[in-house]
């Protein structure tokens, strides 16, 4: 069942040590509609977002905010910094080898952080 962005912002990531099914490709497509700035990889196992910041300092500020959020949620993205101001954010639930609700919850919360940066 898909959620809206507002609903995702109200949720908290739940610990996932495996033992649950990853979202199917159809479920992932449905959930992705709540986080339209994110791309779903063709295999349906990852979502990602690329962002270009005004400068290096603004990018690092956002990375630090994402790090704090990730620690609080207990769910962590892969972050790739390139070209001094480009950030690629990738989300998957490693324990299950695919996407879970946690990925979409964290994506919505990362979007809120990036919106504060004017992105």
Q: What feature does the model see in each segment?
A:
Residues 1-119:
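Long, contiguous binding/interaction regions
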């Amino acid at each position: 069942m898909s959620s809206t962005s507002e609903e995702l912002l109200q949720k908290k990531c739940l610990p996932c040590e495996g033992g649950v099914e990853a979202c199917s490709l159809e479920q992932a497509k449905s959930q992705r509609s709540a986080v339209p700035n994110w791309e779903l990889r063709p295999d349906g196992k990852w979502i990602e977002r690329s962002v270009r910041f005004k400068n290096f300092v603004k990018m690092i500020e956002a990375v630090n905010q994402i790090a704090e959020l990730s620690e609080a949620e207990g769910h962590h993205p892969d972050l790739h910094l390139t070209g001094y101001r480009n950030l690629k954010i990738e989300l998957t639930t490693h324990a299950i080898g695919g996407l879970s609700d946690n990925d979409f919850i964290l994506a919505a919360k990362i979007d809120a952080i990036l919106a504060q940066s004017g992105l």
